Amino acid sequence: MINWQVLGQLIATGTIMLAGPAVIVLLALKKGNL
């Protein structure tokens, strides 16, 4: 069986770790363009 709770936590953690830097880069680019 697949432990969906653990799988969900891993996906959520991975998404946050990837999305954090991406948001910072996007904000930096937007400020740079202004």
Curated annotation (Swiss-Prot):
Q: Where in the cell is it found?
A: Plastid, Chloroplast thylakoid membrane
Q: List this protein's GO terms for biological process.
A: photosynthesis
Pfam families reported for this sequence: PSII_Ycf12
Q: Which InterPro entries match?
A: PSII_Ycf12_core-subunit
Q: Which GO terms describe its cellular component?
A: chloroplast thylakoid membrane; photosystem II
- The question of whether Lipoprotein is a record keyword is answered with no
| Membrane-spanning segments | 9-29
Alphabetized, the UniProt keywords read: Chloroplast, Membrane, Photosynthesis, Photosystem II, Plastid, Thylakoid, Transmembrane, Transmembrane helix
Which superkingdom heads the taxonomic lineage of this protein's source? Eukaryota
What's the protein's topology in the membrane? Single-pass membrane protein
Instruction: Name the protein family.
Output: Belongs to the Psb30/Ycf12 family.
How would you summarize the oligomeric state and partners of this protein?
A: PSII is composed of 1 copy each of membrane proteins PsbA, PsbB, PsbC, PsbD, PsbE, PsbF, PsbH, PsbI, PsbJ, PsbK, PsbL, PsbM, PsbT, PsbX, PsbY, PsbZ, Psb30/Ycf12, peripheral proteins of the oxygen-evolving complex and a large number of cofactors. It forms dimeric complexes.
Under HAMAP family, the record lists: PSII_Psb30_Ycf12
Q: What NCBIfam families is this protein classified in?
A: PRK13686.1
Q: What is the protein's known function?
A: A core subunit of photosystem II (PSII), probably helps stabilize the reaction center.
User: This chain belongs to which protein, by name?
Assistant: Photosystem II reaction center protein Psb30
Its lineage opens with: Eukaryota, Sar, Stramenopiles, Ochrophyta, Bacillariophyta
